[in-house]
UniProtKB/Swiss-Prot annotation:
Belongs to the RNA polymerase beta chain family. It comes from Streptococcus agalactiae serotype V (strain ATCC BAA-611 / 2603 V/R). InterPro entries: DNA-dir_RNA_pol_bsu_ext_1_sf (IPR042107), DNA-dir_RNA_pol_bsu_external_1 (IPR019462), DNA-dir_RNA_pol_su2 (IPR015712), DNA-dir_RNAP_su2_dom (IPR007120), DNA-dir_RNAP_su2_hyb_sf (IPR037033), RNA_pol_bsu_bac (IPR010243), RNA_pol_bsu_CS (IPR007121), RNA_pol_bsu_protrusion (IPR007644). NCBIfam families: PRK00405.1, rpoB. This is DNA-directed RNA polymerase subunit beta. The lineage of its organism: Bacteria, Bacillati, Bacillota, Bacilli, Lactobacillales. Keywords: DNA-directed RNA polymerase, Nucleotidyltransferase, Transcription, Transferase. It holds the Pfam family RNA_pol_Rpb2_7. GO terms for cellular component: DNA-directed RNA polymerase complex. The RNAP catalytic core consists of 2 alpha, 1 beta, 1 beta' and 1 omega subunit. When a sigma factor is associated with the core the holoenzyme is formed, which can initiate transcription. It comes from the Bacteria.
Amino acid sequence: MAGHEVQYGKHRTRRSFSRIKEVLDLPNLIEIQTDSFQDFLDAGLKEVFEDVLPISNFTDTMDLEFVGYELKEPKYTLEEARIHDASYSAPIFVTFRLVNKETGEIKTQEVFFGDFPIMTEMGTFIINGGERIIVSQLVRSPGVYFNDKVDKNGKVGYGSTVIPNRGAWLELETDAKDIAYTRIDRTRKIPFTTLVRALGFSGDDEIVDIFGDSELVRNTIEKDIHKNPSDSRTDEALKEIYERLRPGEPKTADSSRSLLVARFFDPRRYDLAAVGRYKINKKLNLKTRLLNQTIAENLVDGETGEILVEAGTVMTRDVIDSIAEHIDGDLNKFVYTPNDYAVVTEPVILQKFKVVAPTDPDRVVTIVGNSNPEDKVRALTPADILAEMSYFLNLAEGIGKVDDIDHLGNRRIRAVGELLANQFRIGLARMERNVRERMSVQDNEVLTPQQIINIRPVTAAVKEFFGSSQLSQFMDQHNPLSELSHKRRLSALGPGGLTRDRAGYEVRDVHYTHYGRMCPIETPEGPNIGLINNLSSFGHLNKYGFIQTPYRKVDRSTGAVTNEIVWLTADEEDEFTVAQANSKLNEDGTFAEEIVMGRHQGNNQEFPSSIVDFVDVSPKQVVAVATACIPFLENDDSNRALMGANMQRQAVPLIDPKAPYVGTGMEYQAAHDSGAAVIAKHDGRVIFSDAEKVEVRREDGSLDVYHVQKFRRSNSGTAYNQRTLVKVGDLVEKGDFIADGPSMENGEMALGQNPVVAYMTWEGYNFEDAVIMSERLVKEDVYTSVHLEEFESETRDTKLGPEEITREIPNVGEDSLRDLDEMGIIRIGAEVKEGDILVGKVTPKGEKDLSAEERLLHAIFGDKSREVRDTSLRVPHGGDGVVRDVKIFTRANGDELQSGVNMLVRVYIAQKRKIKVGDKMAGRHGNKGVVSRIVPVEDMPYLPDGTPVDIMLNPLGVPSRMNIGQVMELHLGMAARNLGIHIATPVFDGASSEDLWETVQEAGMDSDAKTVLYDGRTGEPFDNRVSVGVMYMIKLHHMVDDKLHARSVGPYSLVTQQPLGGKAQFGGQRFGEMEVWALEAYGASNVLQEILTYKSDDVTGRLKAYEAITKGKPIPKPGVPESFRVLVKELQSLGLDMRVLDEDDNEVELRDLDEGEDDDVMHVDDLEKARVKQEAEEKQAEQVSEVVQED
């Protein structure tokens, strides 16, 4: 027997074909959300407060200081928040200290700081009753970047940019004349020496001393001449910079100094963040810059006078490692003191080394380092600027390397915690201005923190972020896999990110650093391709927000692959050679072969096993969760695999889902971590279990109660239904499944079913990927799903009185009210069809709406029914089903309703949708199709043992698409069905063709895995043997019921008077320019005329036509379309005298758009109302005559 048994949870065993020993379990798949939010609560929020506070008043006599904060208990539970359309949030209380510096008085007070949304255990937020997710953002990391550019003459120039987390950009660039310029915050460029002089190093010799003698430096110094001898060089430089930054304003050296300090050296205005400081120190680090350079001077230990390295030595990795402590210490450190006019007057410590120029052995190049400022230095320092300039000048000498902007070492993730902290900071900054004014205006003696703090800007910023940010998204809740994928999504869009239109090909493309960090397969098709990605299965964020991936360490001394796990970011990995997970190993862990496949930077090639540093942890670390659920992924073309991964996320939860016979072993973990199942929080024994509740007694005697959701409406309108798995007396351990969620079976993801599939044509019905299906799948509810739709009706106060929910609806027969209760609300369990009343509601009608007869009747009989009109909630088109639930919210019950709303009624209607012609189906390999025909079971082809086939697919769908995985799954699935087992074939480590055939033979199938099929209609065998097997097929969310749409009478657009478009607006079908050509080609003039007039925007004509049709008269001639009038008006607005003349040159009067319609022109709706009114009046007249007769 090929393969070995593996247990997944307590309910499923699979035969696995994996050969690679897994040394690391998958991490919790939603930790990117939960860890980041927890981080924010533990440290991020405190950091934001400490950044903005203390706040001083303008006279600096008072300080408002931050002491601490506390989150109290949430107002609503999760379920209550969902029901009441509220947010699941906790009140936050912040303690402030107000210090009066003149009197020394201190007032400490706790201030309510608004309600802060809290993340649920599932990694989601509940905002206004809807479940939302904050998508992590992929942005360019703060730091220093160097790039090269080639001009039109083929000359190579260099550029450099310092990008902060917030603050001004500082750029350097060279031009065609070999002069180096700098730009501050995208303004006009100035010679870079001007900025050096402004920093207090004004002499030409001083500049050459710092940077060394090079052509770029000399050329720039020549360009940067001393124009005004009355100013010092530094003052002149400062004024020149000020002129660039604030053109047109009077320039003084003092104002320029304070401006530069504010731009770069003030931590409140300029912030590199921890990650920016880390990246700058790493890029400007001398150990990497000196690597493989020839040193041009003796390196001498300053304390002992010992020569550490002699001039002429090549600085190899070993040489650098031997003096690393000295380089990190005080080796070659020089103190430069700026002159008195400088922006920053503190001494600047630089570390300088002289090396031989790689291009010219007779020249010496100076390499300047920033002497590694500490991590907590978040602003730029003069040493950083000088070291950056040095690196930039060194590039022209061939020392150093340019950066690849798409490298994942230069792109980082802003997860939910950081995004929230940024938003909170914006709110606090707005509040700060407000507080400062209040502190200055009001009397110091009586002030308390409560009085000067206005929390509205903070709560508004947070609310705005959750409600309308591009990164706060309505959770994709089609099925548990789509939830999980959404939580692990990485978007390059959003504020501070890219825009779709500007993003080029390079940003979207797969980069070698994506390996193990971002999935190369799972990304949307269309304009967002490559901009929205998914975290790979083992991906994990470090403290700086860079994605790490795990590797097994190779012990270089023994050559053995250890089980020690090392997590590496992309730029750390660049220094090492990594072998693949499937490298063959001996018993002792050493490599079995001399040469192994591996990766170093962007190169995939064979390496000697002796130089390998790390080995991949698992073959599936390359791909995301959805991609890892595709069996035989290695046999599919990448484009189709992309569709397969994306379509699994669109699967509709079925009534009775089944886990796949052929899985990948990922189904269990995905279901477990998705948050859609009920998972045990502690060990214990089940003491009570039913469909809605499970109670578990813990070992310490306490009780855990788990609630099981039944048929709740999900965000996608599908049924979110959990099924209890445990029985009374069962022992459960922490992490066990207590109940399956939607699309799960026995604790495994189960998105579809396992039908018997044959690759064959049948009467041409599976032309172009169409799917032929057996009626069994309809009758036995194999592909039946439940959908829940929510409808609501609210009563408001109007000018004429309040609206009412009632059973007494004018002009509605008793038959239509049979399922309404005494209040006029539909009963639960009622079957409703389109147009049925769900909530009876009447709205007061003004006197002006009444006709003369109605007023007379009102006067005689005091008949109230005439004063209201029917505004009941009715079932819309395609909305028929069974009423599942009704919720009523009123002010009297203490429910929070919008202002002006007195009562809100929500009705939930459940639909049971069987699969039908027009529904979309798919396999897991991107093989999608539409159901074209449902054939009676007796007509379907059948196997020799009499089993009818369930689905027939077109064999032509396989070769050109190159997704051969589906064929392998088909054969293995049939073997699994015959053997009565489930199989796991993990991606890139699954069943080989030998395993496949061995299993096929074990199952007693023919050696080619094909079979004779018999025609169900004739009983004759088909000419050729057919591939028949079991394939996992899913039903997708694109169902024909949601797309079918027809219009007879409906709404029109206000300006053009043409029908609206789309199903949601009950619109018409657009008959466009090309369709008009088609009818013109056939000469179908009358058909064309009525399409362009009655059916579109001939307002008068369509009303007369409607009238004629209802009264059975001939249809009159059409008039002038409204769009013609619009054209005339548009030309008149351009000042053209445009008139319409008839054959006799008489002017034709066009009805003016703004004059309102003529009285004799009625709307279609008015005609409909008139008909109803006429019937009602006839009824009324009958009642009157009856009354008269009785009298």
